[in-house]
Amino acid sequence: MKSKCVIIAGEFSADVIGVEIMSAINNIEWYGIGGPLMDAKKLNKFYDWDKISAFGLSDVIFSLPRLYYYASKIADKIIKINPKIIVTVDTKGFNFYLIKLIRQKLKTN
């Protein structure tokens, strides 16, 4: 049985790094968010990465409701999968919030 792992990459440079990580580790069932390179490696996608992408201060501010919504949905999916590890690549602000949210949800369950 393959181990389940989650990887979150929200932009092209993260997709490049993410596919290298996925290629280096065998016998893993990968879940998460990535781009076309990670898709080609059979990533079980939660959502398209445009759901968690925002560039520039004004885009981030206007995207906050969407980012919070998807962070909550992604956290629920990760908790349900119960992965061995969670790998986050780039999109630091979103990923830090996501990990914090997962911890909070696990404490309340």
Where are these regions (language model features)?
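Active-site and donor-binding regions of nucleotide-sugar-utilizing enzymes
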Residues: 4-109
